[in-house]
Amino acid sequence: INATGALNSGLDDIISGYGLFENDTAVDVDFLLQGSAQGGAEQTRALATKLIQVAEARKDAIAFISPYRGSMITDTTDQEAPTVLSDADITDNVIDFFDPITSTSYAVFDSGYKYMFDRFSNGFRYVPLNGDIGGLCARTDINQFPWFSPAGTARGAILNAVKLAYNPNKEQRDRLYSSRINPVIFSPGSGILLFGDKTGYAKASAFDRINVRRLFIF
């Protein structure tokens, strides 16, 4: 485990590990989580591409992808107080990161990182939200059905979060959403929640919605 709380392993090992999920007969899985995005933009895109490849091949799972850490956070010697970029810079960085990633209805892109307490290190750290978005889908499965949207005030609440590294305003949310990226926001009175339910599909289609893709998987 490195200083940011991520596994200290190479991209090659992670990609090889995800390759084990390609066999849908031997491995039963619904959600493919990117996990840490501590590498640079190109490394994180390579991991995202692998996850999408696995999901597309299986056709019974969805990949959850967050932007690379450096798009919004610059780590310092104090891991509890890294430098966070301006919202304007983060918006541009996140859109630029996701833009080259292939169009697919088997992936969900989110807007960033939450600040949470890590009980294992007894400290706070920024963690990518892909695990949380996958968790919202799992919770929706349990409490409702896969064809319900996991977003919004009713089902989109993100738990175990103190704050967000990036809380986009309306104009920034609109830019993100039109770029296939689901904003996660802080809403007064509602807390931190997922504010979009798009897949990574670039064309206007029923399959550009998470609940529709999951209905057909179900």
Write out the residue ranges for each language-model feature.
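A glycine- and small-residue-enriched flexible loop/hinge signal that marks low-structured segments
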Residues: 1-218
